[in-house]
From Swiss-Prot:
Pfam families: ACR_tran. This is Uncharacterized 17.3 kDa protein in cblS 5'region. To E.coli EnvD. One of its GO terms (molecular function) is xenobiotic transmembrane transporter activity. InterPro entries: Acrflvin-R (IPR001036). It comes from the Bacteria. Gene3D superfamilies: Multidrug efflux transporter AcrB transmembrane domain. GO terms for cellular component: plasma membrane. SUPFAM superfamilies: Multidrug efflux transporter AcrB transmembrane domain.
Amino acid sequence: MDFGSLSGDAGGTTTTVVFVMALLVAFLVLAAQYESWTSPVAAVMGLPVALLGAMLGCYVMGTPVSIYTQIGIILLVALSAKNGILIVEFARDFRAQGNSIRDAHSRPDISPATYSDDIACIRIRGYAAAFCNRSRGGKPYCTGSRRSVRYGTEYLACHGLYS
């Protein structure tokens, strides 16, 4: 990747630190919210895929790593964790109805993969709305003054959400 700033030597390590700190803060906030150490694991499982897509998108587009890209990483962690939270909440509601975890996988009418797909399909509307709002909401950010500096945030967020 091309480091487009004067602090290019420190940019690679800073990006790694920002990613690790954002992931750690997201996990700890979710652990406090769910009062459990296992539920947040399910909520943050999609983060590596989103970050891989974001970094690949930035590499393909030739976006330099800057402070705006690092802000985009933090935004992406938050948006991807939100999608995981919605799926975990749906599963918790299923358990609150008196069903066990095994009930979801032992139902004769659906397979475990279908159940997971059902959860994702039900929640896809909210995820698609978040993607569209993030994509369209960033347009003024990318078309205003100094847009050449800030486009990295939008590329990173859109590519990460798309993956």
